[in-house]
Structures are given as C-alpha cells and as structure tokens.
A protein has these predicted regions:
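N-terminal pre-domain/capping segments
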Residues: 1-70, 74-96, 281-283
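Non-cysteine beta-strand/loop elements that form the S-adenosyl-L-methionine
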Residues: 27-33, 64-68, 174-180, 209-221
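Active-site acidic/histidine proton-transfer and metal-coordination neighborhood
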Residues: 76-175
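Active-site beta-loop-alpha junctions enriched in small/polar residues
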Residues: 7-11, 34-36, 71-73, 111-113, ...
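Acidic (Asp/Glu)-rich catalytic clusters
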Residues: 19-25, 45-67, 93-102, 131-138, ...
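Gly/Pro-rich active-site loop or hairpin
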Residues: 117, 154-162, 184-255
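Short, electropositive alpha-helical surface patch
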Residues: 80-93, 118-131, 157-167, 194-201, ...
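Conserved, mostly hydrophobic/aromatic
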Residues: 21, 69, 87, 98, ...
Length: 283
C-alpha cells in the first residue's frame, strides 16, 4: 500500500498531528515533536503520549506511516565542540521523544561543516553523533535526509550519505529519506521517467533500497543543480509531474511514508488524491 501524507502541524499537542493528517485524507504524516526553532522543550507528559497513541490506534496508523522530523537547529557536523555537543544532546532528546511516542524513525538533515573543517572530518562527526543517539535509544532508526547542498550542507550526494553510514558503528539502525526537490537541486535529473530510473539505479548501487525509510515529495522552485532548497506544489515547479507518476508506479516506494512538504497546505488534500491516482494507473 502507498502511505501518502504531508508534514502537518502538531500545535496544541502531538496528538493533533494525527487529526490534521486525517483531515486532509492522508494515511501518512510527518511532524515535529517539539518546537523546531527552539533548543529546549518540556518533556512529553504521560497524557500527551497517551493521547497520541490513542489517536494513532483510533485512525489506524502504525509507526511505519509516520516520519517525525528533528529541529532545524541541530548540526551534528558542527566543528565547534561546544556547539556540536549541544546539537548531539538535542538530537538524543529528539530520538527519545520519538521512542516515547511508539514511533520508529527520526528524519534529519545530516549537518554542515560551515567551511571551518574538511567535509570528510565533518561527516565523521555526524557518524559519531548518530551513534551517540542510537546508543541511548531502542527501536528507533536515524533517517538521513538527502540535502540540496545549500551552503556547506552535507548529504548532497548519495556518496556522502553512504560515507556517513559506513563510518557509524550502528549501521543497522540508519535509514535514508530521499527528497525529490533536494536531489534535483543537488544535480540528479529526475525530470523524465528515464532520468528518474537512472537516478534510482544509482541510489540502489551506492546506498540501497533496503535503507529507504521515507520520501519527501516536493516539486522544485529551484533550478537543476542550483544547490538551492526551494519547494513548490506538485506540477508547479521545475520537476513537473513526470517523476511523481514514475515514483507512484514503482512498487519499491510502497509501505513507507511519502510526505509532501509542498508550499501550499490548502492543496495537500488535492495533491494526495493526485498521487493516489498515479498509484492506481495502469502503465
């Protein structure tokens, strides 16, 4: 089955994310478990955890349909030891919150070297930060997101992500999330069915579909290989609808959260329906 949804608001309590997903006809969703623009957050209460789990059961959601996202402040590759420690501790807390909610994966941007150290050294710091979080949680996967490579952000290429994974001790609990806008901006041309197939063959060779634990389905306002991260509604950007038709016809993308982060929430229910249509078309 295809699990399709969007990154919905959890304002007023994490359980509201479930209700907000249902309201747009989604059977998957992403959420922040805390304010993504602040370092500290009060711990989840027993009541909040209980309400979330009850909502999940009531609406028939399982962990594999949910792709939580961590705070944008976190940079596991930060060359400054003090700032990096702050990021690692915040990442551990994010992973623990996911575990408390009965979920099994946390999506995150790997980090940036800030042009202060070699990229490879920064990637090693990221690997070590991931290990720290995995050692303090159980049953939760750290899911590395492909990036556009804006600024000094790492994870722009499949090779960089593979490098981060191979230097971690706990590789069995590391997954990957591919963002269609990001990989296009990073230089992977997926605008045609042939291009999409070629890029996914490359992904399989370098990382492997066995690690794929989610997708972010975004059209791109940014141009090809621009290394600029700008999302657009489906069919309204430089990708067009072809890659999404190809993706939805490929059974490898079933049974994982396919998450819209497109720029107009009012269109999400229509975009979900459109993707469902693509998924049922006979080729």
């Amino acid at each position: 089955m295809h699990y399709i949804g969007a990154h919905v608001s959890a304002s007023g309590g994490v359980h509201n994310a479930v209700e907000n997903a249902v309201a747009i006809g989604a059977n998957a969703f992403a959420l922040f478990t805390k304010n993504q623009k602040q370092w500290k957050a009060p711990p989840l209460t027993e009541e909040q955890i209980s309400l979330f789990k009850q909502a999940m059961v009531a609406h028939g959601f399982s962990a594999k349909q949910v792709l939580p996202h961590d705070s944008y402040l976190i940079n596991l590759g930060n060359p400054d030891p003090e700032k990096r420690e702050k990021s690692v501790n915040a990442f551990i807390e994010e992973m623990q919150r996911v575990e408390q909610l009965g979920l099994d994966r946390l999506n995150f941007h790997p980090g940036a070297h800030l042009k202060q150290i070699d990229a490879d050294d920064s990637m090693l710091l990221i690997s070590q930060g991931i290990d720290s979080a995995l050692e303090q949680t159980e049953g939760v996967y750290a899911v590395i997101e492909t990036t556009a490579g804006q600024g000094s952000a790492l994870g722009r290429t499949f090779e960089e992500i593979a490098r981060i994974i191979e230097r971690a001790k706990h590789q069995d609990r590391i997954g990957v999330c591919v963002d269609t806008c990001h990989i296009f901006a990073a230089g992977y041309d997926i605008r045609t069915a042939e291009g999409f197939a070629s890029v996914m063959d490359e992904y399989e060779r370098i990382i492997g579909f066995d690690r794929l634990m989610g997708m972010h389905l975004n059209d791109a306002k940014s141009t090809y290989a621009s290394r600029v991260d700008r999302h657009a509604p489906l069919g309204d950007g430089n990708l067009g609808l072809a890659p999404f038709k190809t993706l939805m016809a490929d059974p490898r993308f079933k049974n994982m959260p396919l998450i819209l982060e497109t720029t107009n929430p009012d269109l999400w229910s229509q975009e979900i329906e459109l993707l469902r249509t693509f998924g049922t078309e006979k080729n």
